[in-house]
């Protein structure tokens, strides 16, 4: 079963979240469990929903968007934001906020900042195209950033990023929405749960 953004938002208002474990080291587990609870199959599709993306997060913490590695061809080929994987993924996102005790806080869509995210994406793309080695970098609007996201393999090695035969990072990187942005979404744009779901 694949849901639309609106169907997912309605279903979330009626979901019992007490059964979802608090995320520990792998914060993606909550999102996977949330998808299963909603009947959304875990898959490698670009977006979770028919018409958008589902992102769960802890209020005030950054939100992982997508791995950098698979976006490099678009970055180096100057693919416009609205046609890029990141642009498609983030253009219609349903944010699902939890507090640190795993209590459901509500949902939000926040499309009015897409232009600011696009500007940050372009800042980051310029940085990547000109950097010899990647470091944490945040766009000028302070919404989107890249930083390391990697874990060691069974041999104790990270997964370096190479482009055109050159190593540009000795670890994997990902795009994130900053904690500051996630906090702003939490405080100003959440549709609060109904009493039936509390």
Stretches with model-predicted labels:
Residues 1-28, 32, 36-39, 43:
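N-terminal, Lys/Arg-enriched amphipathic/low-complexity engagement segments
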Residues 42, 50-56:
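Conserved catalytic cores of phosphodiester-cleaving nucleases, focusing on short active-site segments
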Residues 59-83:
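Mg2+/Mn2+-dependent nuclease catalytic core
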Residues 85-153:
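Acidic, metal/cofactor-coordinating or nucleic-acid-engaging core segments within structured domains
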Residues 144-145, 152-166, 171, 179:
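Phospho-regulatory, Ser/Thr- and acidic-rich intrinsically disordered linkers and terminal tails
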Residues 173-175, 184-186:
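Long terminal regulatory regions of eukaryotic proteins
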Residues 188-194:
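Conserved small/polar residues in nucleotide/adenosyl-binding loops
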Residues 198:
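Gly/Pro- and small hydrophobic-enriched strand-loop and loop-to-helix capping segments
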